[in-house]
Amino acid sequence: MSNTEYSDEVLEVASEAGHILLENGAEISRVEDTMERISSHYGVNSGHFFVLSNGIFTTSSASKYANVEFIPLRGIQLSKVVAVNRLSFDIAAGKHDLAEAHKKLNEIRDAPAKPAWEQILGSAAGACGFCAVFGGGFMDCAAALVVGMFLYIYCLTFSSRYLSKIVGGISNALVATLLCLAAYRMGFGTSLSNIIIGAIMPLIPGVPFVNGVRDLADSDYIAGITRLTDAMLGFFCIALGVGTSFMLDGWLFDGIINLSGVIVNPETAGLGWQSLAAFIGTAAFAILFGVPIAQ
């Protein structure tokens, strides 16, 4: 293999690592650092990497190599981010040659997502936990748990497969709120506001929002604005879905339910219950977003 071919192969591996990181929710600075770490270890210092929120541009000043990849905004799979990050440090420590690194990256990229039942469990437990955190009582939490479960069943079986991102976001919030309204009208729960807050928590685009802020703080203004726009669009879709569901409910029952605001139920207001609820909600969302258990 000539020096030029070797250099191009190294840049291909670095680009592959960046691709996996970016499409699974890593921030821009992590993507750039990882790509530079890999190429530097293999002796290629002529690579230049320009990373946006949905694209990677790779060029070399020592050859004619150039690569542009479009990477659409997708779901969050933090286990793959952790795996690539760990692999890059192993590469820097000299534990893998180029062929092994390429093979490892392919294994990470082809790794299956979390099983559907784990995602459904994470959504249900997260909705239940955060309903309690925001003041819901035991019946409110039970209603949020059931709604969170059916919400993610709907997300996995229908909206993520057949609907666009915007329409899917609106329909997810619509379905969640309609289920909350149905549960409340049947007598499950005492605070509709708390049930809805807990139920829609799995839909909140928290990772894109935080990454957008971090990118702006790192002076990556294009990527930061793009991700913040994506997150704000998600918030808008949730609000539109919730509002539409109240309009439908009011049309069916000749009147919109008056929300009393967030009510702190004394059943779960104690420090012990709040700590337990926060732990359950955080652990559930860690499962939902694919955070690995072993570090």
Enumerate the language-model features and the residues they cover:
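Core alpha-helical transmembrane segments of integral membrane proteins
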Residues: 113-208, 285-293
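Helical membrane-embedded segments and adjacent short helical loop/helix-boundary regions
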Residues: 74-79, 115-120, 167-168, 234, ...
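A generic alpha-helix surface/boundary motif
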Residues: 12, 29, 33, 82, ...
